[in-house]
Amino acid sequence: DYKDYMNEQVKKNIPESEKVRVILGGKERMDTIKNGTTAITNDNGIHDDDVIVIHDAVRPFVTEKILNDSIDCAAEYGACVCGLPCADTILHSKGGEYVEDIPVRSELYSGQAPDSFRLAHFIQMQDNLTEEQKKVITGTSQICTMNNQPIHLIEGDAINFKITTDSDLLIVRTLLGGK
């Protein structure tokens, strides 16, 4: 069973592993997040100053600065996402054949994880989503935009890149000295 295997790995590799729980994911991204928030609240309750940090395993090079800034930002503003100004021109195309629009690059940012939120408010926003909205979410911070709630932006870091392609894996191997 995958959960048993993960629990064994946690105990074997993480100091103070009693503070770590493995929570099974769900069919959709939002199901996984709901499983996590439910486990947190069942174990600990919810306090007004609690902050939840949601991060993707496909971004293993997140920095301590990003994590600390994200937590501080969410504590102050309620919701936080990190990102970088887009370096490339973005082309908007509905079918991939013709360019419909070219947005103003100076107004665009490439979103990264983590996303951080005051937990109680996040759970309320999560519970307000329709089933249709839950299916189209590509980033946790969209929960805020779908609830017409502001989300504060902090500066990310290029090293906090997402590993999704073969070329990303090549970069990782290079960073790790060819391993």
How should each PLM-predicted stretch be described?
Residues 52-53:
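Short aromatic/hydrophobic "clamp" motif used to bind/position activated sugar donors
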Residues 56:
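Substrate/cofactor-recognition hotspot
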Residues 1-49, 129-132:
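Conserved N-terminal catalytic core of the sugar/cofactor nucleotidyltransferase
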Residues 41, 45, 72-75, 177:
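Residue-level signal for alpha-helix termini/capping positions
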Residues 18-21, 109, 152, 161-162:
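Structural signal for short hydrophobic segments within the conserved structured cores
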Residues 160-179:
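Hydrophobic helical membrane-anchoring modules
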Residues 6-10, 70, 172:
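Hydrophobic packing residues within well-ordered alpha-helices of enzyme cores
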